[in-house]
């Protein structure tokens, strides 16, 4: 997803600010370690509940650099620092890990669609209304058309970075950028979430 983060925003989603995650991390994990189960729990507390579980798992995997199933402060702070102060290329390289689920260095259509569906599910729950939204499939297809330059049905890291830097719509959908994140939050006097101005990302933008 520009995820903390844009992460992938997207197909219309928001993700929390990593600084808020860090605060909760310190409060809820004073040991300095967090498991996937714990991460899913506090991720759901500040987004849209259980509908965020699939996306939370992908974010956790991207944070867990050494693949030991635990995220420590070092891994977490490294991601925060990079997403807050890194170059556009750095942010896109981190975003790439979210979509490259099997870590083989390439994103397949099914891998991207899986993330887009998870993000889309979160957005549907958080949004009040949407007019003619793009589907997760349409979003994935559009991104593949624009990024898969050699048409070999996969997106390499180079294609992901170069294509996103050269296409503002794709970059908005995929880049993790702390400065552009907006969070759906419950209003003080209502059980309904406030509508985010970034819902426009659900719509076709050519």
UniProtKB/Swiss-Prot annotation:
| Stretches assigned to the EF-hand domain | 31-49, 51-86, 87-122, 135-170
Which tissues is this protein detected in according to the database?
A: Retina; inner segments, somata and synaptic terminals of cone receptors.
- List, in alphabetical order, the GO biological process terms annotated in this UniProt record: visual perception
An example Pfam family from this entry, by short name, is EF-hand_8
Q: Which residues bind Ca(2+) 2?
A: 100, 102, 104, 111
Please tell me where Ca(2+) 1 binds in this chain. 64, 66, 68, 75
Show the disulfide pairing. Answer: none
Q: Name one GO molecular function term.
A: calcium ion binding
Could you tell me which residues are lipidated, with the kind given as N-myristoyl glycine?
2
Task: Write the signal peptide boundaries.
Answer: none
Q: Which UniProt keywords apply?
A: Calcium, Lipoprotein, Metal-binding, Myristate, Repeat, Sensory transduction, Vision
Which function does this protein serve?
A: Does not stimulate guanylyl cyclase (GC) when free calcium ion concentration is low, but inhibits GC when free calcium ions concentration is elevated.
Q: What else is on record for this protein? A: Binds two calcium ions.
The identity of this protein, by name, is: Guanylyl cyclase inhibitory protein
């Amino acid at each position: 997803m520009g995820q903390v983060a844009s992460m992938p925003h997207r197909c219309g989603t928001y993700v929390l600010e990593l600084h808020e995650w860090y605060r909760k991390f310190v409060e809820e994990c004073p040991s300095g370690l967090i498991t996937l189960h714990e991460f899913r729990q506090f991720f759901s507390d500040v987004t849209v509940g259980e509908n965020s579980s699939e996306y939370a798992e992908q974010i956790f995997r991207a944070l867990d650099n050494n693949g030991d199933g635990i995220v420590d402060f070092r891994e977490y702070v490294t991601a925060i620092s990079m997403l807050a102060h890194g170059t556009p290329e750095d942010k896109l390289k981190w975003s790439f890990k979210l979509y490259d689920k099997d870590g083989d260095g390439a994103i397949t259509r099914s891998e991207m669609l899986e993330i887009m569906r998870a993000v889309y599910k979160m957005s549907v729950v958080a949004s009040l209304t949407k007019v003619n939204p793009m589907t997760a499939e349409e979003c994935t297809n559009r991104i593949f058309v624009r990024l898969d330059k050699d048409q070999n049905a996969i997106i390499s890291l180079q294609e992901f970075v170069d294509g996103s830097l050269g296409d503002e719509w794709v970059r908005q959908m995929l880049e993790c950028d702390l400065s552009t994140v907006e969070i759906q939050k419950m209003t003080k006097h209502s059980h309904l979430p406030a509508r985010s101005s970034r819902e426009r990302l659900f719509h076709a933008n050519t």
